[in-house]
């Protein structure tokens, strides 16, 4: 299951360094959420979930911070209770589960996409 984790730059650094990360919850696309939007496009629903995670990242850090949504693929064993558009994460995530990072630089509904392999290249800039 694809999920989007709200994460801060220091947390991202620790995740990369250790190879694992404990997350309590993540944002997902599910049938309930699908009915909330006037689209059938899976891509648009994925965007909404990733944007919600990125906005939560900004809330965790402060209004002028970068919002980060880490796209991860959860295993069946990691999927906890699902409530609306969020899922509980039952065990640590591994860096190998990371697919990409979506970055919000403003209050606008726009996200920049970075492949997992690009994250180390930009991390120092995001930490500054």
Spans of features found by a protein language model:
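Structured domain cores in non-transmembrane regions
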Residues: 31-63
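Glycine-rich, aromatic-bearing surface loops/beta-hairpins
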Residues: 61, 65-128
């Amino acid at each position: 299951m694809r999920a989007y984790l709200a994460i801060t730059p220091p947390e991202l650094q620790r995740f990369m360094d250790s190879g694992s990360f404990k997350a309590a919850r993540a944002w997902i696309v599910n049938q309930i959420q699908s009915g909330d939007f006037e689209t059938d496009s899976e891509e648009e629903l994925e965007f909404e979930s990733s944007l919600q995670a990125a906005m939560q990242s900004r809330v965790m850090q402060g209004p002028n911070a970068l919002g980060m949504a880490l796209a991860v693929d959860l295993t069946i064993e990691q999927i906890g209770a699902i409530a609306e558009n969020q899922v509980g994460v039952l065990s640590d995530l591994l860096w190998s589960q990371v697919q990409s990072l979506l970055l919000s630089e403003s209050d606008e509904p726009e996200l920049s996409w970075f492949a997992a392999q690009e994250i180390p290249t930009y991390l120092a800039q995001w930490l500054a």
